[in-house]
């Protein structure tokens, strides 16, 4: 009320030019004049009279609780006995509405010294406020001498120290009360107003603030966001709105139109009120086009939805062709012709440059643009040529904007293109949305037999036609030479059409290409060709004067093909044959010697995984894997498997990425396929079959690379396993070592810390100390991304301390599973752990696909190559392999993980000193990033006595507790790592380890002593 009167007074003061306006009313208290905005103090129990005089009739309004509900007050206000609840603002104004801005107000304080509880007067009811609104709690002060006014929780008065809720902004005014801005649900509670006078603390009666939750505004939806109509057609659109309250309405607006024909229906169901508002236009015109907005409004807010109306004066059709194919550059040749119905059809011939990148590029071209005002148009047709490389995907998409919308769309393909054996070689997709339609044809990994004419047919009630696409597949040339009398004919085929050149040179040579040759010009050569075949003739001389080599070279942008013809003199034929036979025999003999030598030098492959048949102490009897049964349910059709890029290769075999169609429940599955190289012997074939049998015997587990299928008949043996896109763990850690170290050091520490200055050196050491010889032809496992993933910008992310613990835990789970299946791995190392795209660690054995002959991780012992630095002492010195020896190797793998991919025993050669160090029980030092618990686990894994080593089940339980602790103390763990790095470089490693041990004891006893007898129950 006071604010309203103040606003009127300010308005009055600004209107100085209005000389004909009367003066504001004047107020008298007990016959004493009080100026505008004056304050007066009364004592409770005394009478008072307020009188207002002015140029015309006046009326009163007041914020006093005693007079608040009296309705319109009349002059004068006569009170026989003043009460503290008469405290408030009294405003007098003219009853004439044109003079409402002229008003006068005063504020009365009615204090009662005998009753301290009346220092504040408050409403009798607890307020209920809606969330998000401002709220004025009128705790009115009756004694202006009370100062230090505050608004606070009631519990704070009792000494609990409770403060206002977070985000509560309160302004206390002695004349108005406490204004709370933007009330939130967290503000609910008991509050009081308080103040101080002469050392005494006065508080108001407490009140309970109830905050009603803010209701969402009504929902609104228009299912048709765009509509197209011809002039004179009917248009209807329905807007559906719903809310939990009945108090909302729905309205339509348009930029130019004001009046609408609207039908409204209401329905209450499921505790919601639904309002459907349908806007109707009987015959649209150009004035009706534009955006129509449907607004649903309530006291909780306004929600809108729009639809756009397009008004056409004639029917139309516009068609585009989008082609997705390999990285190409199109060279367009436009051909235009007139067709009935004011149609211009454009066809484009596309020439593709020789770039075999698998990244897809899109090109869009206009095919047809037609309009008609009522005549049916037929024969909307044109032709387009698309060229593609064999083995790549091609996507043909026709995009049509038309009115009326298309009612029929279809593709016809060459008869030889079909989906055989339930393998989808092509896929059609159709969509129609309002006036826009799309028809796509996906051809997967096109082959030569896929070339030909592809036709798209379309129609609606006014337009019909077809678009033809001539698909050409690039093909490298082939050539043959035929002889007829004295004429050589070189016939070549390929696409693009090859270019043929004849060359001749004296003597019998393999090729004329390395000599100074000239194109034959004896007799004019003739040529003839069609789109894919070409012939060129060469006339031979009647007398050659010796042996002559004629060479035909056919080439196009895909490749070149050479064909040689030897013309011999008769007297030299026998000598040439004799020389040729002798040379061939000598070459064959040398080749046999080389092959025999290589065969003697080639290491015999042995599969690392072993299945235990029985045990007697430390003596294990292993199952011969060749005797394991093979279940032919694993067989998978070869024609449903498309091989891709090589993931890894070795001396005996390789692993390639592949796509399997119809494997399991998925239509398309990305897999890895292990296969033998062509020069592999029967021993390698038997080894791969043994590995297949072992995997099928083990069964499924999340943390091993699981078998998905196999092809053992009708061709080379293929073993199909899960695909792990991140490659092996070793390279994964090394690739992210620098980012991991940077993430655990703050920017300030990096500027002055000597560790940061040496990061590049350390990173270089991580990269160079790989254990792979520089002369090795072994291709390490690498992640390969498909084209779709590249387009989406797949980010493989960084590396965290939690990731290191997770990898350790998952590998332990996988090895625990192997131990329960009586399986010994014998080559546990980071290089034999793969990561999926979700960073799931899976144990594998590269086996045939790892070149151990050129891998420095494998050391020659006798006639075998062994991973000595990962092997347990009993395996090195006694050739004993047990589950406990896998535990030793797992400890070395942990060292690899927490050193971010360093090679174990860095800078230590495998010699007599190394073997003595192993026998003496000397361990590697704690890795840079390993907590105390993990290093203790490593040392327990390296116990000289195998039975003192922990079981994999115990290891899983320990790391599981560390993972849970890491979630709770993630920030603290990184702080410890930062301190660790500084201490290592500053010589304080022992002190740091003592501090970490103390922190470990404070966090709780996560470590359980693992030096207990390890007895695996093998059954």
From Swiss-Prot:
Belongs to the protein kinase superfamily. Tyr protein kinase family. CSF-1/PDGF receptor subfamily. It catalyses: L-tyrosyl-[protein] + ATP = O-phospho-L-tyrosyl-[protein] + ADP + H(+). The modification Phosphotyrosine is found at residues 620, 756, 778, 858, 974, 1016. Keywords: ATP-binding, Cell membrane, Disulfide bond, Glycoprotein, Immunity, Immunoglobulin domain, Inflammatory response, Innate immunity, Kinase, Membrane, Nucleotide-binding, Phosphoprotein, Receptor, Repeat, Signal, Transferase, Transmembrane, Transmembrane helix, Tyrosine-protein kinase, Ubl conjugation. Residues 979-1001 have a biased composition (Basic and acidic residues). Residues 845-867 are annotated as: Activation loop. Disulfide bonds join 52-92, 139-193, 239-294, 490-552. The active site is at 827 (proton acceptor). InterPro entries: CSF-1_receptor, Ig-like_dom, Ig-like_dom_sf, Ig-like_fold, Ig_sub, Ig_sub2, Kinase-like_dom_sf, Prot_kinase_dom. Residues 1-18 form the signal peptide. It comes from Takifugu rubripes. One of its GO terms (molecular function) is ATP binding. The gene is csf1r2. It holds the Pfam family PK_Tyr_Ser-Thr. This is Macrophage colony-stimulating factor 1 receptor 2. GO terms for cellular component: CSF1-CSF1R complex; plasma membrane; receptor complex. Gene3D superfamilies: Immunoglobulins, Phosphorylase Kinase, domain 1, Transferase(Phosphotransferase) domain 1. Residues 598-1019 are cytoplasmic. It is a single-pass type I membrane protein. The chain crosses the membrane at residues 577-597. Residues 19-576 are extracellular. Its EC number is 2.7.10.1.
